[in-house]
């Protein structure tokens, strides 16, 4: 069944979305030099966050300071530039990373980062939470690998964001920053770090003295939803020794020697991270359709990784990364920056590549 034609109201919504996308693209494009300068300044202190990165590498969750640094610098730029364009900063609960208001609209901007080695996070799609879109997502009610399916046509993934706030149009955008992988650098020291934790664990008696009862029983005590007491003790000893220069000379001479050797390795890893220049290889600006544009984007906006509570906007599905209701068929997904060194890699994942300059062009 073919989708109905766009109504005049839907065309007006697409026009406003397109006009704001142009404004956002201009802001980021003209601020790239400032962004790179600020990012370079943050990277001067990479040696101070190298150990936490190493520590997180053995956890199920990964501490990615580069995502956080990028997000904060972009937030700083947008907050100043948006104000100059007449948009007031408007913190809202259940909203995107940044929200703004003017006389006609409420703007949601989500800042996303993706590792170049994880194309599922950026290739032709952008993951969205229920606070990052006003468009209901299609719910696929089946279990993979099993002959179990339900008819969910009447149920969709409904977001927390409304299509309007007090008659002001909701406009949602995503800025996606793709950065180079650095996993192999951390892999060089991961096993050494595990060995250091084991070394400290074996020699805990040097700095941890039992007062009453069994020390081993205390260290193995595990309250529900927490780690064994041993784990945070080791974490704190590592941070105390290598970050705060505490607990020095508390261990035996042989243990101290191994700790000092590991410290030299941390310095070496910090140097390699700095040389990698972990800055965006590409910046992609994406306009996410307003929910009032349904059903025109139903094929592209579906339930995401967290089934029933997230979305994926497949902005390139069937080649339709455009404002469907506009005559100019401008792209909803535009590159604001590409490191030419990575262009051959990016072309494997994006075809065509639409770049924002003063006009759009294809590489």
UniProtKB/Swiss-Prot annotation:
GO terms for biological process: DNA restriction-modification system. Its EC number is 3.1.21.4. Transmembrane segments: none annotated. It is an enzyme of class 3 (hydrolase). GO terms for molecular function: type II site-specific deoxyribonuclease activity. The keyword Phosphoprotein does not apply. It catalyses: Endonucleolytic cleavage of DNA to give specific double-stranded fragments with terminal 5'-phosphates. Keywords: Endonuclease, Hydrolase, Nuclease, Restriction system. This is Type II restriction enzyme MwoI. It comes from Methanothermobacter wolfeii (Methanobacterium wolfei). The gene is mwoIR.
